[in-house]
Amino acid sequence: MLFHFLQAGLRQCRPPARLVGLETGLSGARGPSLPATLANYSRLRNACRPPWRSPWKPVKKGKLLAVLLGPAVLGVGVRAARCQVELIAPPLIVPQGARPEPEFNWAEFWKLLRPQLIALLTAVLLAFGAALLNIRIPLMLGELVNVVSRYTREHAGNYLQEVQGPALKLLCLYGAQGLLTCGYIVLLSRVGERVAGSMRKSLFFSLLRQDVAFFDAEKTGLLVNRLTSDVQEFKSSFKQVISQGLRSLTQTVGCFLSLYYISPKLTGLLLVVMPVLVGSGALIGSFLRKLSRRAQEQVARATGLADEALGNVRTVKAFAMESREMELYSAEVDKSSGQNEVLGVGIAVFQGLSNVVLNCIVLGTIFAGGSLMSSKELSAGELMSFLVASQTVQRSMANMSVLFGQVVRGLSAGGRVFEFMSLEPTIPLSGGFKLPVLRGEIHFKDVSFSYPTRPGHEVLRSFDLRIPHGKTVALVGQSGGGKSTVAALLERFYDPTEGAVQLDGVDIRILDPSWLRGEVIGFINQEPVLFGTTIIENIRFGRPDATDAEVHEAAIQANADSFIRSFPEGYNTMLGERGVTLSGGQKQRVAIARALLKDPKILILDEATSALDTESERAVQVALDRARSGRTVLVIAHRLSTISEADFIVVLSKGQVAEFGTHQDLLRRGGLYADLIRRQNQESQEAQ
């Protein structure tokens, strides 16, 4: 029993904060008039930017829910949600930098639990009934032992007839307890799975709603860990606390009353010994927790090394560094094994001592009980009942000590999940104005911008650019000059720090983001990401309702139809993860087909051919030239040879427009663009 008290160690953490969004969109296209909308927007844009996350506020419903969940939860309190309890557990993925431990959101939990409340209450009643039967069982055993003892001593009467009554009662108790246990486990399993499923769905939807700035600041591994490990941890804790916590607490209280009823003297001796043992266990446990923490940190280092090596396995193989990575990982694993072995020895020694002490308690109970029997203060059956009830108390208290740690771990895991479920994006997913007539004219009006992760570094400074509808404008410049940032602002992945991005004279911050990205803009970047499904489903990604004929037409326009049909499965060919089974040029053309299927009015080409070989570049360039027809096109170029036919070329330098004009005009000026052309030609000649 005392071994389990080791698992209740607390680490104080700071409260979290939540992401708070500023609602700038409208409810739909039928909202206020455009002038009124612009007036509302002008007031909003001058408001202070909201903090990254809002403070947590306690909810009265949460306190009521804590009562419903049983006294086992109440013993932890609200602060327990900010603690981490664990002796031996897998390492959690933690982002760099200090991160405050989030509070458990009882209000959100209540929303998830409310649909399952009837099943939960039924399970609680069944668990309570099973606990009451467990209290009654030691007393019935005592009656049975008294019958056997009396018959052994007196040899009078019919043994089978006398033992039949207590035995049948005990058998009925066992059967009823088994049925109640089966019932509450089934119900709790259903409640736990449904709550966990709803939690995962809500969390995943919340993550998808977040803007790009959120994913710049958070690691993907951390988010996946929230969806998997944290939800699983919370579900397991929830089910165990309800099933085991209520039963253990009821059994402890009930059996203590039974012990006092059977023998107040023996109960008093037990109450004297128990606090001493618990205190000793807590002292030794603090030492073992330090060993455990070091072992966990070492496991985390080994896991991080393996994750990095496997995530970059192509680079590892490209440099033939498999043996070096194996040596590094083996060294970390050996350190982890050594620390865990030391921890295991400590646990083994303590467990052995605990067993000796607990058995001595049993022996002492028999000795003291025998003395009471000799003075006729206790019968054999009562001593048997006392022993069984005391063992039940020990098991229940040990179980509660484990559950205490499980409660804290579960609340901590749930708090981390609810932290992201409660986030509101600064840029809403939908809602806002939709232009009834779209021409496709773009205006970056005195735009300044800094990434949220680098607030002190301006990527764009007073950037001003007007792109007429139906024209192709190319952005060129050195790496880090802000070219891709311009495309990100047009897609409204971010909002400008200053200035505005306008579409047909309307600030895109009052437009519906889902309409803007889903129908107006087609985006093709340097490294297109495909999904591990069929080619036809990848092309349909932007328009799930598109017919096969429309998909085939988009593929023809993207110069992809011929190579797709050359595969044995054609359009139904399954692609590997991220489309690794296709070449770079093939992936790019599938991405172009995906963008063209939406028939966007605006097309963004972010260095779409820079990573391709000459032959693939030629095939993709033909598709891109075809895609530009009748659309406003923003080209972010690395290879300057691909943009000579653009209507206008913009040279970016230090976040500002340095030069603007046609290819021939800029060459004649002999400025930055001409210098870029000259250097690229020189590099090309040297490469040959």
From Swiss-Prot:
This is Mitochondrial potassium channel ATP-binding subunit. Belongs to the ABC transporter superfamily. ABCB family. Multidrug resistance exporter (TC 3.A.1.201) subfamily. It is found in: Mitochondrion inner membrane. Residues 121-409 form the ABC transmembrane type-1 domain. It comes from Xenopus tropicalis (Western clawed frog). The chain crosses the membrane at residues 115-135, 168-188, 268-288, 342-362. SMART domains: AAA (SM00382). Residues 1-31 form a transit peptide. One of its GO terms (biological process) is potassium ion transmembrane transport. ATP-binding subunit of the mitochondrial ATP-gated potassium channel (mitoK(ATP)). Together with pore-forming subunit CCDC51/MITOK of the mitoK(ATP) channel, mediates ATP-dependent potassium currents across the mitochondrial inner membrane. An increase in ATP intracellular levels closes the channel, inhibiting K(+) transport, whereas a decrease in ATP levels enhances K(+) uptake in the mitochondrial matrix. Plays a role in mitochondrial iron transport. Keywords: ATP-binding, Ion transport, Membrane, Mitochondrion, Mitochondrion inner membrane, Nucleotide-binding, Potassium, Potassium transport, Transit peptide, Transmembrane, Transmembrane helix, Transport. Component of the mitochondrial potassium channel (mitoK(ATP)). One of its GO terms (cellular component) is mitochondrion. Residues 442-679 form the ABC transporter domain. ATP binds at residues 477-484. It comes from the Eukaryota. GO terms for molecular function: ABC-type transporter activity; ATP binding; ATP hydrolysis activity. It is a multi-pass membrane protein. It holds the Pfam family ABC_tran.
